[in-house]
Amino acid sequence: MDRTRGRLGRFRPWLIASVPVLIAGSLMLFMARPGVSAAWLWLGLVVIYLGFSMGSLSQQAWASALSPDYDQRSRIYGWWQTGNVLGMLMVLLIPPLVELGLNGSRVQGIRAMGWYIVAMLPVAVAIAAWRVGEPAQDAYDRPARRLSDYLDLLADPSIARLMLADLLMGWAPGITAALFLFYFDQIKKVPEAEANILLLVYFVAAMLGAPAWSWLAVRIGKHRALAANALMILASLLLVMAVPMHQPAVAGAVMALAGLPYSGAPLLLRAMLADAGDQLRLKTGVDRTALLYSVLTGTGKIGSALALTTFIMLDALGFHARAHDNSRAALIGLQAMFVGLPADLSLLSAVVILGYRLDAPRHLEIRAALARRGDGG
């Protein structure tokens, strides 16, 4: 992507090219007939993840190029994250709407999700390709061919801190997502239907919280806002653990507070990485925007994958999801993993990011130096 040049720009062609790949993967998975082979499903996952990587990476890197301004980048990624959560909510609401509103089956609801994706993707990408500009690139590029090229990125202190923070802040919500229904069923004794409603409240709050984190970043700086986000995640986890969930109003309020920080880390880390990319370009003369965002995407996925190890640990403790007589040790382990481990990871990420030195005044100096060199970015 960093090597792409042409009349359509650097990122637009990749976003457009992701559409047929995502459509193909969606049709393979959402329209799969009963009895399809594991190989077919595996291939469908490969296709859809390929398309998703193309689309999300081009989108994130493109957003970083829309403005060189420190604060404006926070706003851009704030609306980007708002759109992400809104889109996720819209898709997740399709199955219950089909089942409850149209008397459809669960299978029809799942397929409706696929058709929604197939129908909306070309429209959304066409609007973005038509209406969103892409500034010209002045810095030269040198393709990364060796492992050392990637390791050199992590030698930059700002980039290394961002990658570590992304790993930690991807790991923590991955754990809570994986164990959410188990925790509310086994520890809080909340029925699955009510737990799903609480999850909806959580994501609505996450969507509404995204602009708030952008606003806070403009007021106190991105790295301080990110540290505050991590500490709020920690506090919300302790609140979820401490407050009984038997009263719907109380449970809803607690889950709304817990959802508010959900959108903060993705948008703030990406806005900060755009600033770190400017610093790297000043140092090397090379624009590695797409490479930086691909590495950040990778650290987030590693964090999500690490979250799945909690299933192995729960199994070792003898926890059974469908059982109603899990041992005390298994339930303590579940609570420790749902609350304790993400809380520790959030605290550690706050410590990591408080050492970050690329603030607004420093970024202004970097942009001025790039301008003097004739590299507007």
Could you say what each language-model-derived stretch is?
Residues 1-377:
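Membrane-embedded alpha-helical bundles of multi-pass transporters/translocases
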